[in-house]
Amino acid sequence: MCKIYINMDNFDKQCEYYKNIENRRNNPIDLSKLDNPDNFVEIVANHVFSINENKLTDNLTQLLFDGETDIEGIFCVYLELILYGINILTNNTSSVFDLDNIENELIDKIQKYLGSCGIKMIVREELVDNIFMFRDKSSHYCEIVPKPPSFLCVNDWFVLNYRLITNVKNKVKSNFTDYWAFFVTNSGKTFSVRFDYKLS
């Protein structure tokens, strides 16, 4: 006679995980009731990055997903989220331009926090001979640069002290991982950032 053993701890965790996702789907946050709905990424970032790093779980999965947001929109939200996250975790003392290598502790922390939201962040160092030719390619979605003085800030995409310059040559893509951004650090290195859905 064959006996089948089921690990109830894992089963209970999976049930709790799916229950949480279903609860988020059935009880979305109504952003229209916020004083300024445009600040919703900042509000979510303050919530996510205020959690003690040692108490992170997967219960934030689906926090920023809904059935109507397109892939491009999801990419933009997560890109803004990491910029706010760096600001929060460093008490506004550091930026993406201060990163010196992809093995940075701050990158590890951001990856851990995003993991609790069901997203995997992929950071790579790009080997670039000519930054102008690299910028001219059509493959990246946007470049992150320092925000210019206020008199130069016209209608554009700004987050904190960053300006995000969208690539007019970039075409709409159907795969989440095909969207990526890049930035040049203070030490002259070029890093790219992509996202993927984290499988539980």
Curated annotation (Swiss-Prot):
It comes from the Viruses. This is Uncharacterized protein L462.
